[in-house]
Regions:
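Bacterial N-terminal signal peptides
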Residues: 6-13
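Positively charged n-region of N-terminal signal peptides that target proteins for export
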Residues: 1-4
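Cyclophilin-like peptidyl-prolyl cis-trans isomerases
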Residues: 16-192
């Protein structure tokens, strides 16, 4: 009986304890849930990592709580690399989305919180300018591993549900650095 119980626990742990696609153990959250709309609809759940990037996670939680991420487009989506969103200043649907990727929020830019974690499939990082201390509201979700980003960008979480939705996001033009025409978007973002 004990062996059966151990086998069941190991089986349960193998299926439920790791983030979808990233191979990173799920933590206690908080979780950022993105309701996605556009050419693909569904839910993406990101396990945020306050132990890795406390200031960045706090800023994401605050912005989601204000509704700032609602109606923000996935403005830059590069097949095999990543999908970027979160420009709450210029990335709102119906606005000047051609400027998406250049804005932030009313909150201050954040100092880098680099870690020894790796950018693998499903990992979520903060977008920034060439200044490592310029991350604000924008973030990206990895389609595949990108070791050249390790230690250069702040990791804030990993996808634990809905990676198939991320995979189906409308891709951008590679010649235009992944800029997406008529992009998919975040209908509503919540944190639990």
């Amino acid at each position: 009986m004990r062996k059966l119980l151990v086998a069941a626990l190991i089986s349960l742990g193998a299926t439920g304890a790791f983030a979808e696609g990233s191979g990173v153990p799920d933590t206690d959250g908080p979780n950022l849930t993105l309701e996605v709309g556009g050419s693909v609809t569904g839910k993406v759940v990101i396990d945020l990592l306050p132990d890795v990037a406390p200031k960045h996670v706090a800023q994401i939680v605050a912005l989601a709580g204000e509704g700032a991420y609602d109606d923000v487009v996935f403005h830059r989506v590069i097949d095999g690399f990543m999908a970027q969103t979160g420009d709450v200043q210029f990335g709102k649907r119906g606005g000047e989305t051609r400027m998406a990727g250049m804005g932030g929020s009313h909150l201050p830019d954040l100092p880098a919180e680099f870690s020894n974690r790796s950018f693998v499939r499903g990992m979520v990082g903060m977008a920034r300018s060439s200044d490592p201390n310029s991350a604000n509201s924008q973030f990206f979700i990895m389609f595949d591993a990108a070791p050249h980003l390790d230690g250069q960008y702040t990791i804030v979480g990993h996808v634990i549900e809905g990676m198939e939705i991320v995979d189906q996001l409308k891709k951008g033009n590679p010649a235009a650095n992944g800029l997406v025409e008529d992009p998919d978007y975040i209908v509503h973002a919540t944190v639990e």
